[in-house]
Amino acid sequence: MKKLVLAALLASFTFGASAAEKINFGVSATYPPFESIGANNEIVGFDIDLAKALCKQMQAECTFTNHAFDSLIPSLKFRKYDAVISGMDITPERSKQVSFTTPYYENSAVVIAKKDTYKTFADLKGKRIGMENGTTHQKYIQDQHPEVKTVSYDSYQNAFIDLKNGRIDGVFGDTAVVNEWLKTNPQLGVATEKVTDPQYFGTGLGIAVRPDNKALLEKLNNALAAIKADGTYQKISDQWFPQ
């Protein structure tokens, strides 16, 4: 009898383990503090910890695939992963291709440059401003400030390196991200007003899924609501965005 009970328990455990849902998230790990490659060559960041908390709430297993930002939505559509969490603004244009969860982070953007050099976008006429290719920052500058010379990069990290070395005049990125750079680079400062244009920066950051994956979208939204209610979200936010 004991053997039968043990066998039944083992079978139940094996079934439960194999039945756990696996969710593969596409990320572009070049954008700290949202996502970047850590000391142990692991992907770390606010988005990563958030995704892990969501998976724990859903009793699912998380994995992450690192791709260039401008390939994330095409790769999602080709089913290379189940969802994208990568500091991605919810915009009308993107919403034509993918479905987004409710916003998980309010967003704004700003240009940083050598301290006390510029004050507004009007001061940037003819200046070389770096940004990551395929981002809403790039589209905003191209559409709204064509007088600015856009310099596209495969990652914001490379843009920031060029800014420090004087090869470009500024970098346009999310406020939370550039604030991290400013903490360790006192020679730099905010060079423009904050931008929150909903046409480009939407209603915040969201997790993208394929439009036909309504089940996953619902699970993610429910899990997001749950971790906000129980304080988990705030703990993660406080860790990565200390006041």
From Swiss-Prot:
Principal localisation: periplasm
GO biological process: L-arginine import across plasma membrane; L-arginine transmembrane transport
GO cellular component: ATP-binding cassette (ABC) transporter complex, substrate-binding subunit-containing; membrane; outer membrane-bounded periplasmic space; periplasmic space
Signal peptide: 1-19
SUPFAM superfamilies for the chain: Periplasmic binding protein-like II (SSF53850)
SMART domains: PBPb (SM00062), PBPe (SM00079)
Keywords carried by this UniProt record: Amino-acid transport, Periplasm, Signal, Transport
GO MF term set: amino acid binding; arginine binding; ligand-gated monoatomic ion channel activity
Pfam families listed in its UniProt record: SBP_bac_3
Classification via PANTHER family: ABC TRANSPORTER ARGININE-BINDING PROTEIN 1 (PTHR35936:SF36), MEMBRANE-BOUND LYTIC MUREIN TRANSGLYCOSYLASE F (PTHR35936)
Family (UniProt): Belongs to the bacterial solute-binding protein 3 family.
Function: Part of the ABC transporter complex ArtPIQMJ involved in arginine transport. Binds L-arginine with high affinity.
Subunit structure: The complex is composed of two ATP-binding proteins (ArtP), two transmembrane proteins (ArtM and ArtQ) and two solute-binding proteins (ArtJ and ArtI).
Name under which the protein is recorded: ABC transporter arginine-binding protein 1
Designated gene of the protein: artJ
